[in-house]
């Protein structure tokens, strides 16, 4: 609330950076607006919606991740923008958002999915000019578990707000079932959690990572509870949840709790030419 001034302006937002990460935190504003009716929150929500309306896009309509990352879609961006856009469309009766959301989800799946592993590469560069981009596919070289987790969480969350009769739901349901099938293949059998680099459990420096594991558990639990995937996945979800508690939750001397083994960042490009 302190970040929104009396006119509804988001104080820290640099609008023209077209940073898609700006959008996700706006989801909390729907609750504020519903409970208070304060017009400041509506102005802020409209600003975030306006950013997405003006966000630079790939030739097939995919949101660029940021202005400084031209022609690039990252799995992260689906989580950062699509659930917000879906909720905005539902609350304010903007039905135009649904086709756009489905296109974002399907487009990045089409560009980043690797049938050999059943996993999604972290990012895709349409221009194929980035140091990290495969010169034939434009994909980044690695499978970063948290990015896949963000994508998985996004595809179950958008369905909360998308009309049941909307034809694009079927394609999202297909993606959800593909994700579930492949995510459980990489669940570490002894601990029930997942590796930082999803498919490289024996690689030196790789480790069991808490944020990705949490997102995968969230995805599996919600997809089972909503009936999107067979109930048989409940066992994997429970094994993952128990693994989170056992592997990553640490009680401190003062009685507080810490979540451990959380990756700080694993981006693409920029300083040091990160490869995700």
Residue positions per predicted region:
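Acidic/His metal-coordination segments adjacent to aromatic residues that form catalytic metal sites
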Residues: 4-12, 62-67, 128-141, 195-205, ...
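Well-ordered alpha-helical segments within folded domains of soluble proteins
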Residues: 1, 17-34, 74-90, 144-160, ...
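Oxyanion-binding "anion nests"
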Residues: 152-201
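CBM-like carbohydrate-recognition segments
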Residues: 5-9, 13-20, 24-26, 32-35, ...
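Inter-helical turn/loop segments and adjacent helix faces that build the functional surface
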Residues: 36, 88-99, 158-170, 223-231
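Short, contiguous, pocket-lining structural segments
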Residues: 73-80, 93, 97-100, 135-150, ...
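Surface-exposed beta-loop-beta
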Residues: 119-145, 152, 156-173
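Long, well-ordered core segments of solenoidal/helical folds
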Residues: 1-12, 43-62, 98-124, 128-131, ...
């Amino acid at each position: 609330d302190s970040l929104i001034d009396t006119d509804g302006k988001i104080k820290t937002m640099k609008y023209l950076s077209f940073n898609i990460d700006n959008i996700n935190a706006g989801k909390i504003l729907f609750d504020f607006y519903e409970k208070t009716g304060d017009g400041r929150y509506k102005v802020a929500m409209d600003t975030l919606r306006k950013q997405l309306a003006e966000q630079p896009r790939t030739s097939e309509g995919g949101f660029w991740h940021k202005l400084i990352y031209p022609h690039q879609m990252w799995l992260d961006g689906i989580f950062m923008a699509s659930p917000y856009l879906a909720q905005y469309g539902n609350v304010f009766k903007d039905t135009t958002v649904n086709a756009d959301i489905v296109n974002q989800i399907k487009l990045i799946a089409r560009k980043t999915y690797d049938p050999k592993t059943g996993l999604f590469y972290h990012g895709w560069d349409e221009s194929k000019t980035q140091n990290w981009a495969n010169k034939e596919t434009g994909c980044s070289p690695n499978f970063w578990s948290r990015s896949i987790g963000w994508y998985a969480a996004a595809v179950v969350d958008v369905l909360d707000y998308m009309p049941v009769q909307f034809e694009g739901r079927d394609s999202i349901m297909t993606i959800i079932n593909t994700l579930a099938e492949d995510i459980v293949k990489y669940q570490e059998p002894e601990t029930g959690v997942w590796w930082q680099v999803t498919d490289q459990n024996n690689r030196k420096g790789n480790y069991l990572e808490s944020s990705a594991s949490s997102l995968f558990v969230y995805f599996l639990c919600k997809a089972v509870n909503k009936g999107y995937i067979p109930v048989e996945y409940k066992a994997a979800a429970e094994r993952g949840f128990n693994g989170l508690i056992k592997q990553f939750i640490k009680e401190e001397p003062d009685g507080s709790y810490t979540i451990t083994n959380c990756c700080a960042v694993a981006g693409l490009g920029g300083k040091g030419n990160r490869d995700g």
